[in-house]
Each structure stands twice: as C-alpha cells, then as structure tokens.
C-alpha cells in the first residue's frame, strides 16, 4: 500500500530548468538614473519622471524600469510630489 502512494525519488524525477530550453537569455535592465549619473531627482523635472509612469499614470515597478531600490524610492517620492503640485496627473484619460 505504501509503495503505490510513495513519491518518486530524486533520481527518478526529471530535473526542471529555470529557463525554457532554447529560450533567449534576458538582458539585465540598466538603472537609468545611475547610468546617467543623476544625483538629485527633482519633482519639477517632469520629462525624467514621465519615463517611470505608465500610459495610465501609474508608477512603474522596479522590475519593469530596472532602477535600484534606493532610486525607485526617490522616483516614487518625486512623482507623488509632482502629482500634488499638479505637474503630473494622478490618472490619465483614455
């Protein structure tokens, strides 16, 4: 009875790879702020901040933009300040 319900051992189980076979390797995203040596992210610099906002006006996550955690916090704070000062919209119209 225990033989029927037992799990296969590690040697019997096929190994799965994290990346699909033959798939292209993903290139690591570059932190735009660090690459361009931007030390201060100003809330009045809407051209820079618009790079980190989606079409609908949402703040893009780190995994999409490639920014570091520290720079993502700076960008988020600057975007929120710009929204309060009405330099950036909270949401966009379709």
Swiss-Prot record:
GO terms for cellular component: cytosolic small ribosomal subunit. Residues 16-29 have a biased composition (Basic residues). Gene3D superfamilies: Ribosomal protein S18 (4.10.640.10). One of its GO terms (molecular function) is small ribosomal subunit rRNA binding. SUPFAM superfamilies: Ribosomal protein S18. Part of the 30S ribosomal subunit. Forms a tight heterodimer with protein bS6. This is Small ribosomal subunit protein bS18. It comes from Leuconostoc citreum (strain KM20). The lineage of its organism: Bacteria, Bacillati, Bacillota, Bacilli, Lactobacillales.
